[in-house]
Amino acid sequence: MLSAIIDYKERLLAAKRFVIVACGTSWHAALIGKHLIESFCRIPVEVEYASEFRYRDPVIHEDDVVIAISQSGETADTLAAIELAKEKGAFIYGICNAVGSSIPRITDTGSYIHVGPEIGVASTKAFTGQVTVLTMLALTLAKEKGSMTDEKYLEVIRELTAVSYTHLRAHETSQDL
């Protein structure tokens, strides 16, 4: 997950702006990503519905990073948004669950969330995986950029660890009921 961020950190840190394109549940994960990247990295972020992005003439520059998020890696609107952003010279970072799908093949780099198949309409595993990747992206870039102190970085990591333990305890308690 982090290798794509570390391998392309110079390009990611050089971004004047991030634009996140997604649909459905992935769009909701993108809203959290916007908050994290802006708060931790101090880089402006726009979140766009891929279905709207593709039908207008978005202002995209070569120093923009476009993050494309899709559980399936085959969302037609997100694929079209990627192609449009590539034509305008943006660097494309994909976040996807499906290994070998179209989105990872056409982006410059990216991360898989590896959460397995989603059963049902509510895409809870994919949402959690997407937010996790966006969190790691924001934390890694903030640390590299120096926009977050080491103390704050460690505090956030400790808080995230505590969330995992709290979830596990709640799960164990619910199993006992």
Where is each model-derived feature located?
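Glycine-rich phosphate-binding loops that contact phosphosugars or nucleotide phosphates
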Residues: 13-162
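Cationic, low-complexity basic patches in intrinsically disordered or flexible, solvent-exposed regions
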Residues: 176
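An N-terminal, well-structured beta->alpha segment
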Residues: 1-16
